[in-house]
């Protein structure tokens, strides 16, 4: 990576500003998945071990008006982080002002402070989300000229707490998580060990057009599953019953199939049901066509076997999007089958591009078998699309 990293700067005695991604799910004030907090620990620990004073920034959820602040405080995160670090985390509970400044100035080497939810600044004119120049400048002024961006999950957004701070400090550097994310995903796409197979699922073709186009140029094969299968089917005149379809994307699907030159591998059967939720019948289709009155909710057994074969010998695999409605046990065989086909390849570099695929791997007990699971759905999608991430572009060159 051609950007400075946290190891390239002297941190001792410095107030170090750090953008982390603590956007964790909360239920009744309790964190239900702490993966993102755990993922940030190596960078935070390194800073405090080097004698730096870590000042952490993160958003949590969406905040548009005063009422949205309810249940969005980072207080539970501060408590969880303190337990994980085995030391106190100073939490002033504000995003600016004398109280915050006093708490920062009172920090000693090796201490950690967490600023309140950066999106609380969105209540009055979206200052955080629209990268308000004054806010970025103010937050930058709270440190000693060093900013560490370790929030891959927001690297595709230009916010005051990442791009804004970066532009107002002497050195803006990457944390370990951001560095690893870029290394795994970018290297997999740009300089893969071959054969390189990409697997794309999820419900909408519209979400993945750019990704499919980019990966058709880079990968040896692109396997398609999930709800978007049926838009590709309909584009070829295959019956899809009541399956999900994007009528306005049929021409796009047709064009992608023509451009693919045989690289796009589609399912050859489906697991179908006579309703999405209150169904009374579930069965496998004979072939590609979905029966009238039914909808496809997972890839079928023949498709699992076909995808298993397509993955044989693969050395690099990037997977983004489940093969079916994996949250329902009746429709998770496709996602499980593809996961198992990926991880059994000898010496494979296997990467999950965040979002629902990461949730599937975690919920279905396969997470530890993958080389890398991305912490950022939107950011990893944009990297797979070949886009430049604003949060990364704003960092200091080596």
UniProtKB/Swiss-Prot annotation:
Its EC number is 2.7.2.3. It is an enzyme of class 2 (transferase). Belongs to the phosphoglycerate kinase family. ATP binds at residues 208, 296, 327, 354-357. HAMAP family: Phosphoglyc_kinase. PANTHER family: PHOSPHOGLYCERATE KINASE, PHOSPHOGLYCERATE KINASE 1, CHLOROPLASTIC-RELATED. It catalyses: (2R)-3-phosphoglycerate + ATP = (2R)-3-phospho-glyceroyl phosphate + ADP. One of its GO terms (biological process) is glycolytic process. PROSITE patterns: PGLYCERATE_KINASE. Its main location: cytoplasm. GO terms for molecular function: ADP binding; ATP binding; phosphoglycerate kinase activity. It comes from Streptococcus sanguinis (strain SK36). Keywords: ATP-binding, Cytoplasm, Glycolysis, Kinase, Nucleotide-binding, Transferase. This is Phosphoglycerate kinase. Pathway: Carbohydrate degradation; glycolysis; pyruvate from D-glyceraldehyde 3-phosphate: step 2/5. The gene is pgk. Pfam families: PGK.
């Amino acid at each position: 990576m051609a950007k400075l990293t946290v190891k390239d700067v002297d941190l001792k005695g410095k107030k170090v500003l750090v953008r982390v991604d603590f956007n964790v799910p909360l239920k009744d004030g309790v964190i239900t998945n702490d993966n993102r907090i755990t993922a940030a620990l190596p960078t935070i620990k390194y800073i405090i071990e080097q004698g730096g004073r870590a000042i952490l920034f993160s958003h949590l959820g969406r905040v548009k008006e005063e009422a949205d602040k309810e249940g969005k405080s980072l207080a539970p995160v501060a408590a969880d982080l303190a337990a994980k670090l085995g030391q106190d985390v100073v939490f002033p509970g504000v995003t600016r002002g004398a109280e915050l400044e006093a708490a920062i100035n009172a920090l000693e080497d090796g201490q950690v402070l967490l600023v309140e939810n950066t999106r609380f600044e969105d209540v009055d004119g979206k200052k955080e989300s629209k990268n308000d120049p004054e806010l970025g400048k103010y937050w930058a002024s709270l440190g000693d000229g060093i900013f560490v961006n370790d929030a891959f999950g927001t690297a595709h957004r230009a916010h005051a707490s990442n791009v804004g701070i970066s532009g107002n400090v002497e050195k803006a550097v990457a944390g370990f998580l951001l560095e690893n994310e870029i290394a795994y995903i970018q290297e997999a796409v740009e300089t893969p060990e071959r054969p390189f197979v990409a697997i794309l699922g999820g419900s909408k073709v519209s979400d993945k057009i750019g990704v499919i186009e980019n990966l058709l140029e880079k990968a040896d094969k692109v396997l398609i599953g999930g709800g978007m299968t049926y838009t590709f089917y309909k584009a070829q005149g295959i019956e899809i019953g009541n399956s999900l379809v994007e009528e306005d994307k049929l021409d796009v699907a047709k064009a992608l199939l023509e451009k693919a030159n045989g690289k796009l591998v589609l399912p050859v059967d489906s697991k179908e049901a006579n309703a999405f939720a209150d169904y009374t019948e579930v069965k496998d289709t004979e072939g590609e066509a979905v029966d009238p009155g039914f909808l496809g909710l997972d890839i079928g057994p023949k498709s699992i076997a076909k995808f298993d074969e397509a993955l044989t010998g693969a050395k690099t695999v990037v997977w983004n999007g489940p093969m079916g409605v994996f949250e329902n046990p009746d429709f998770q065989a496709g996602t499980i089958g593809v996961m198992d086909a990926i991880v059994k390849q000898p010496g494979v570099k296997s990467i999950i591009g965040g979002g629902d695929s990461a949730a599937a791997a975690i919920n279905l007990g396969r997470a530890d078998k993958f080389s890398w699971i991305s912490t950022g759905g939107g950011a990893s999608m944009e990297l797979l699309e070949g886009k430049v991430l604003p949060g990364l572009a704003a960092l200091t060159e080596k």
